[in-house]
Amino acid sequence: MKLKLSSISMNHKNVLLIKLISAILISFFAFRLFILHSSEFSPIFASVTGKFEARFLPPEIIVPENEDLIPQDIEVEKCDLFAGKWIPDSVGPIYTNKSCGSLIDGHQNCITNGRPDLDFLYWKWKPHDCLLPRFDPRRFLQLMRHKSWAFIGDSISRNHVESLLCMLSTIEEPVEVYHDMEYKSKRWHFPLHNLTVSNIWSPFLVQAAIFEDSNGVSTASVQLHLDRLDETWTSLMPSFDYAIISTGKWFLKSAIYHENAKLVGCHNCQEKPHIEELGFDYAYNASLHNVMDFLAAEDNSKGTVFFRTSTPDHFQNGEWHSGGTCKQTEPVSDEEIEIKDVHKILKDIEIDQFKRAVREKTNQDGGNLKLLDFTRMLLTRPDGHPGEYRQFRPFDKDKNAKVQNDCLHWCLPGPFDYLNDVILETIVNG
């Protein structure tokens, strides 16, 4: 009887041992399967062509319902972050016109100004070949601790810096620490992270004498020195860890051109028939040649320099001073819209000069100079402009009032915020 009990006890122990070994083996193969499955995702690195490969790092915070903050550090896949489409998004912006009203220029605060439709806020940018994580303000601030940023250019650069400040203000309020006499150049500080963000006004990037009022009305042609860079920004470049530089639309203004301290021609200067008409494309090409050479020289900056392509406007039935309007309320597809000839000329010059500078001045990899080609991305958002709501509640007194339309700048919040999603991804994974 004792022998039988002993035998049963041994058999019971063997069964338990077999179950334990089986559980260990099942866990091991399940883990292997998980690892193999994970390898289907991919890492991302920046290239001078504007195309990127994606490595998604773990987010510092998770926004509710934010399916785009995905696990990262996985495998590499090539992805052009600038080629994609706008898709519906139920989440919307991370800030509002009220929460960031003090930082938004009044002309771009469309909702406060009375814009009645809000559907334009509920679209997000989706690259064709990969997922783009949403902008994570906490993560950005942590990455940029003790760093300095600069946005250099015209009023679109101001539009851009205000977008970034609003997104970051959801974590920490910036403190304005400097402005020039005309409030065109400003600097902010995030004291908890020791991050400095500057906006430097230099609409041509080269030296220019400008004669116009705050509404853009000129009293004389611009005097433009195509071969002299504006020291307002060049003198500060060594102090910036990151800079985003852009220009474009100001070159369409009437201007007198100078090179080597000599008058060489003009654009749209019919009142001076003795001066040769060279066209804005001549001036833009000559100016950007010098700008790109400066940016590509590593001795001129200590950090990463992004050149952002010019942004398209969406004026219809006229332009800024001739009654142009923009009444669209949703995005369009690439097939539904064509780039205007003038925008194509600007864009082609920008790309050509960028590639030339990379080819001639760097080791073919661009060095610290990178390209942000947002032209097509923004071309498909004709609904993102202030339009009639550039001024505060323009139709309160007269529903038929004639108002200045703004189809050049961008509503905040709005589609312009998604530029920051792309920029953060290129920085994190570049």
UniProtKB/Swiss-Prot annotation:
Membrane spanning stretches: 15-35
User: Where is the protein situated, by its record's location annotation?
Assistant: Membrane
Pfam families reported for this sequence: PC-Esterase, PMR5N
Entry GO CC: membrane
Where are the disulfide bridges?
A: none
The alphabetized UniProt keywords are: Membrane, Signal-anchor, Transmembrane, Transmembrane helix
Task: Indicate yes or no for the key word Transmembrane.
Answer: yes
One example GO MF annotation: O-acetyltransferase activity
Q: Where is this motif: DCXHWCLPGXXDXWN motif?
A: 406-420
Q: How does it sit in the bilayer?
A: Single-pass type II membrane protein
Where is motif GDS motif found? 153-155
The UniProt entry lists the main location of this chain as membrane
Question: What else does the entry mention about this protein?
Answer: Contains 2 motifs that are conserved in esterases, but it is unlikely that this protein belongs to the catalytically active pectin esterases.
What role does it play? May act as a bridging protein that binds pectin and other cell wall polysaccharides. Probably involved in maintaining esterification of pectins. May be involved in the specific O-acetylation of cell wall polymers.
Q: What protein family is recorded?
A: Belongs to the PC-esterase family. TBL subfamily.
Q: What is this protein called?
A: Protein trichome birefringence-like 24
Instruction: State the encoding gene.
Output: TBL24
